[in-house]
Amino acid sequence: MRQIVFALSFALFSASSAHAIECLNGQSGDILSLESWELLDRENEAEKTINIALHHSGPVGIRLIDATVRFEDVLGERIGEFPLERADGIGAGQDHILNAVVAGTILERLENLHPDDVIGIACVSALVYEDGTLQDFSD
């Protein structure tokens, strides 16, 4: 299977973008950092797989999480959202890869926009740390 890779370092281009992406409704954008993303071909040409690399730099691992990765263009128009699986544990200082199938207008936008014009953020609504501490950002 041929791979189309759009691996991007979000730290490089989000600092120079015209629009700063933010989490909504009291969600936290400080728990997980969005490191890169890539589109991979699938057998069905109308779909691709998106791999999103996240990093948790906190001192305590996460055992349960309610989070979504959002993408926008640098002018602030929404491209799409990808929810994390709630039960995916993420160790302290560890990376996590979110895999999702992408199709339709989301895929078209990701393929047609220049990679420097796509920005993303991982927004956390709530989580349970490995030590049992519950943190809810909607309060």
Set out the residue ranges of the language-model regions:
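Intrinsically disordered, low-complexity Pro/Gly/Ser/Thr-rich segments with frequent PxxP/GP/PP motifs
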Residues: 77-113
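Bacterial N-terminal signal peptides
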Residues: 5-15
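Short, acidic/polar linear motifs in exposed loop/turn regions
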Residues: 56-61, 75
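Solvent-exposed strand-loop boundary residues in beta-sheet-rich modules
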Residues: 73-77, 131-133
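Short, hydrophobic/aromatic beta-strand segments
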Residues: 61-68, 78-83
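Low-complexity, acidic Ser/Thr/Pro/Gly-rich terminal tails and inter-domain linkers that flank the onset
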Residues: 20-53, 57
